[in-house]
Swiss-Prot record:
Belongs to the V-ATPase F subunit family. One of its GO terms (biological process) is proton motive force-driven plasma membrane ATP synthesis. InterPro entries: ATPase_V1-cplx_f_g_su, ATPase_V1-cplx_fsu_bac/arc, ATPase_V1_fsu_sf. NCBIfam families: PRK01395.1. This is V-type ATP synthase subunit F. Keywords: ATP synthesis, Hydrogen ion transport, Ion transport, Transport.
């Protein structure tokens, strides 16, 4: 079993290119369907963590939600270079509330 799991980031080109310097695999997308297919492909090829920019995620909610119910991959929403939509923050808050029974954030 591979000790090191792969990490990828999906989003618009300007937002994801900086992650390449950190050694993270980057997958620039333009169209919603391209984003769906990319996330599905990453999930099927052993990526443990997939970061998705909020601006991309807002248009592919059903794909994001499908992976929320699974242990791996962890799909984590991040702000794009255009700023945040607070979707990722809200998801974390919801998950914490679900886990502990009260919103502590």
């Amino acid at each position: 079993m591979d000790m090191y799991k792969k990490i990828g980031v999906v989003g618009d080109k300007d937002s994801v290119l900086a992650f390449k310097a950190l050694g993270i695999d980057v997958f620039p997308v333009v169209e919603d369907e391209e984003a769906r297919k990319t996330i599905d492909k990453l999930a099927m090829t052993g990526y443990a963590v997939i970061f998705v920019t909020e601006h991309v995620a807002k248009n592919i909610e059903e794909t994001i939600e499908r992976y929320t119910r699974q242990v791996l991959p962890a799909v984590i929403l991040i702000p794009s270079n255009q700023g945040t939509l607070n979707i990722g923050k809200q998801r974390i808050s919801d998950n914490v509330e679900k886990a502990v029974g009260v919103n502590i954030l």
